[in-house]
Amino acid sequence: MTKEKKHYICSNCGNTSPKWSGQCFDCGVWGSIIEEKVISNKNIAKIGSKQDFEQLSSNVTDQVRISTPIGELDRVLGGGLVLGSAILIGGDPGIGKSTLLLQLVAGSFASKVKCLYITGEESLDQIKLRALRLDLVNDKTNILAANNLEDIIASLEANKGNIDLVVIDSIQTIATRELTSPPGTVSQIRTCAHELVNYAKQNNIIILLSCHVTKDGQLAGPKLLEHLVDTVLYFEGDHNNHFRILRSYKNRFGGVGEIGVFEMSSSGLIEVTNPSELFLMKREQNVIGTAIFAGIEGSRPLLMEVQALIVPSNMVTPRRSAVGWDVNRLSMILAVLSSRIGLNLANYEVYLSIAGGLKINEPASDLAVAASLISAATNKPLPEHSVFFGEISLSGEIRKTAKAEARIKEALKLGFNNIICSKSENLTHDFISSIAHLKDLKLLLGSS
């Protein structure tokens, strides 16, 4: 016998409470507490059915992957889509998630995989107009406008065996009749996503869930969907910039940290197969305060431009700002430069930016940042065709970094023949300038 209970849940963070309150005690948000019905069962073991165990034998075949016509997507996924997998694609509203998903299911992919595009945000006519604008109109892709979970499951059951891939755009618009809370709340998102993922795994179909992120970059509040799915992808970019980056943050069938680069155009998303060349295109030489960093994103080497600007300040605490880089790490590099080579910027405002709207999390970018700061402070350009990579310790030493050969190969391919890196890399080529300390960098750049 089941017993119906009620509790109160925060629509922002998912925290539950037995009583209503005006403010969530966990996240502090006001007016976010809503009532939710909970069905509990005290005799779960009695109503359950016995399941047979299986042994983890060596007779296991590799997962069959389905290659898509979007090579950058395949790179991020680890080689293609896996049957029975659940994939979550998050990103800001309007960043291009729907465009990417429509290009996937309505392109040449639809001729070999039976696809269903379910929209909860747009009407069918809007989807058709967007497909017409992107030149994706075909008679192979099925589309459905639905907001109710039960209707979606019933439609999938009625077409069982005729669907290989399902797109839900977006999960925030789907609701179940079992809950009284409105669509988009934590309980609705969690319940609907759980049911859809379970259905996909039981029927060995691929499901892609589109999900908006909140202001602080979280998926539907407390990232409550990430543990439900096999793969989590984030679509990153700036609305004022035409570059888009698809990055993997979780992948049970491939590597984490892989990126795919796209360019947004009037005809949709265009793959960028050589992002280093694109990000450095039409770049002027001998620009003061700029340095090229040879980075690694996942398994892909990528050259990025680091820009620094230093201006005098009358403020007691001059401003330090960083776009695309950790501002706390910038403060650390400034402290090391001041302590180890006497570059005191205490009375200057410091601004750092990564060109192209990219974000760098690698410690190996320390050396490029330091070089750009020295160039901006001394008002001298860096040597032409130079590339930097290396981690800087608090003592000012330049540490060894991973995948140095791949970084150097990418730099040489694009015409950069002056590689400045750590001496501990043990590389003796003529085009490599090995340094052990920031003092060596200062001498190499000819700063006084």
Curated annotation (Swiss-Prot):
Zinc finger C4-type: from-to? 10-27
EC number(s) per entry: 3.6.4.-
Q: Which domain of life is it from?
A: Bacteria
Where does this protein hold ATP?
A: G91, D92, P93, G94, I95, G96, K97, S98
Q: Which PROSITE patterns does the entry link to?
A: RECA_2 (PS50162)
Provide the Gene Ontology terms for cellular component. cytosol
UniProt similarity note? Belongs to the RecA family. RadA subfamily.
Q: What does the comment on domains in this protein's record state?
A: Has a putative N-terminal zinc-finger, a middle region with homology to RecA with ATPase motifs including the RadA KNRFG motif, while the C-terminus is homologous to Lon protease.
Indicate what this protein is called per its UniProt record: DNA repair protein RadA
Organism whose genome encodes this protein: Rickettsia bellii (strain RML369-C)
Upper lineage:
Bacteria, Pseudomonadati, Pseudomonadota, Alphaproteobacteria, Rickettsiales
The gene behind this protein is: radA
